[in-house]
């Protein structure tokens, strides 16, 4: 498999989901442990080491960014969720929404790309119903910040 930014986002969601279930004391050590466990970075996948390093950095930026600003991200999400408690959502949905808001807030990735990537991640790791939730929440946030 050739790794892409989509793959890096998948890695980030896997790490964020694991971190939500068992919060790490040392984020870098946590990420290093993850890299030691996955097979996507094996030499036989054919991708150049430099490209893999950039994708690892892309994923790590998101994981460290989200974990470093959980309270801020949750404070943004709670009012948008209306009458839903953040912890009533599934772990995957929380991770996808947090990373989606973080990307919208902290990167120059176009809003439509951020939202579509988050929708696809929710669909891949959770269920088709999650797509609707993620789309609605991130779209509301994107519209609110662009005013």
For the regions a protein language model found, what residue spans apply to each?
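N-terminal interaction/assembly modules
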Residues: 1-147
């Amino acid at each position: 498999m050739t790794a892409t930014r989509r793959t890096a986002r998948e890695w980030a969601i896997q790490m964020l989901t694991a971190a939500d279930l068992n919060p790490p004391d040392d984020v870098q050590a946590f990420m290093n442990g993850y890299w030691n466990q996955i097979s996507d970075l094996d030499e036989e996948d054919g991708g150049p080491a430099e490209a893999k390093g950039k994708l690892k950095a892309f994923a790590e930026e998101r994981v460290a960014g989200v974990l470093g600003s959980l309270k801020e991200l949750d404070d943004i999400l709670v009012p948008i969720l209306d009458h839903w408690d953040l912890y009533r959502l599934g772990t995957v949905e929380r991770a996808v929404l947090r990373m989606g808001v973080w990307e919208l807030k902290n990167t120059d990735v176009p809003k439509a790309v951020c939202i579509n990537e988050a929708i696809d991640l929710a669909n891949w790791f959770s269920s088709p119903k999650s797509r609707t939730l993620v789309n609605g929440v991130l779209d509301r946030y994107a519209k609110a910040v662009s005013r």
